[in-house]
Amino acid sequence: MKAQSSVLPVVVGILVVIIAVAVGVYVYNQYVMLSSPSASSSTGTSTGPSKISIPYSSSNKTVFLTIVVESSSNVNQFNFNGTSSGSLVIYIPAGSTVIVKFINQESLPHNLVLLQNSTPTPQSPEISSDGKIIDIVGATTSNYDVNGISGGASAEGVWGPISAGDYMLVCGILGHAASGMWAVLVASNNVTAPYAVID
């Protein structure tokens, strides 16, 4: 009986390591897909930005989205996946559920808000003046304007199903969106598989 009980913790430990490595690889691959400007469609002459595929389960209309606040001397500290001021545009099929992983590599706290915008760009330090808050990752409805996840932390959320329309992804902390920390999300009946473009 002693031999069996000493094997069980080893097996459990190995399984935990395998799962941790698999999750790490999955998150890294999503990050690379959305942060690199590499194309899924490039054939010599280009008429616009390249499409970057986003992981998707068509059987249950679920989009798997990773948004990273990058910490680099090459990017604005108010960024999503190294982009700012709406240059990241994400297209998803209308009616999709989005499982979002939000990672903050920057030293300042940040959060991620899905905003059904009433303005084309963030106009006010307080984001609720720019539209209707649909959901929040990394804060709550009572503290999104001052709280977020700290550097090195991550948070996850589930949004949707998201109706057809134009939305913004913004950091809700006062002034962050107006400083460029926003991207565009378009939910459309004409989109069959999610993708992103970086202008």
Curated annotation (Swiss-Prot):
A single GO cellular-component term on record: plasma membrane
Compartment list: Cell membrane
Residues covered by the Plastocyanin-like domain: 79-188
Database matches in InterPro entries: Cu_oxidase_CS (IPR033138), Cupredoxin (IPR008972), SoxE (IPR010532), SoxE-like_C (IPR049544), SoxE_N (IPR055193)
Membrane topology value: Single-pass type II membrane protein
Chief location: membrane
The entry's keywords: Cell membrane, Copper, Electron transport, Membrane, Metal-binding, Respiratory chain, Signal-anchor, Transmembrane, Transmembrane helix, Transport
MF GO annotations: copper ion binding
Record-annotated membrane-spanning stretches: 7-27
Binding site for Cu cation: 110, 171, 176, 181
Family: Belongs to the multicopper oxidase family.
General function of this protein: The 4 redox proteins SoxE, SoxF, SoxG and SoxH probably form part of a membrane respiratory complex together with SoxM, a catalytic subunit of cytochrome oxidase.
Name under which the protein is recorded: Sulfocyanin
Species, as recorded: Sulfolobus acidocaldarius (strain ATCC 33909 / DSM 639 / JCM 8929 / NBRC 15157 / NCIMB 11770)
Species classification: Archaea, Thermoproteota, Thermoprotei, Sulfolobales, Sulfolobaceae
